Design a protein with these regions (language model features):
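Short catalytic helix/loop segments, enriched in acidic residues and glycine
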Residues: 25-38
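Conserved N-terminal subdomain of the carbohydrate kinase-like
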Residues: 4, 15-27, 42-121, 126, ...
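Extreme N-terminal starter segment of soluble prokaryotic enzymes
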Residues: 2-8
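Active-site proximal beta-strand in glycosyltransferases
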Residues: 140-142
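Active-site metal-binding loops of divalent metal-dependent hydrolases
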Residues: 11-13
Length: 142
């Protein structure tokens, strides 16, 4: 019997360099796919996560350790990477610089399984295109 999911969260893993207003820098592995994936799984929804990254930059198993979801991933020539320079303690003002972009997502590379909702958790222009959204909408809610 094929797997069935309430939601599939799709997006790039990101290597983020976050610099606070005092100049302290933290390297963090995250991105919208990580935050949304943990949130969806934590809600009790049957969750699949599909992400892309270059495996030399981050360990998928380590980053998603403890998530109550099935995690799928595909190698990318590059990993999404963002530098955030914050100028205030409340982090309301920042400069955001793209340092790397993963390969675009295509519907045919997603795990082929029944999914009620496709949640696209992108970070930069080019992660997704209209053809991906159109095809996903034929298979579930977008």
């Amino acid at each position: 019997m094929a797997q069935k999911y309430d939601v599939m969260v799709i997006g790039p893993v990101s290597v983020d360099y976050n610099i606070d207003y005092l100049g302290n820098e933290r390297r963090e592995i995250g991105g919208a796919v990580v935050a949304s994936g943990f949130a969806a799984a934590g809600s009790g929804a049957r969750t699949a996560i599909f992400c892309k990254l270059n495996e030399k930059d981050a360990d998928v198993e380590e980053r998603f350790r403890g998530v109550q979801a099935d995690v799928y991933w595909k190698a990318s020539s590059a990993t999404c990477s963002i530098r955030n320079q914050y100028f205030t303690a409340d982090k309301e003002k920042r400069q955001c610089t793209s340092l790397g972009v993963c390969d675009p997502f295509r519907f045919e590379e997603l795990p082929q399984m029944e999914t009620a909702v496709y949640h696209f958790a992108g970070l930069v222009y080019g992660d997704f295109d209209g053809a991906l959204f159109e095809e996903a909408s034929r298979h579930g809610k977008v």
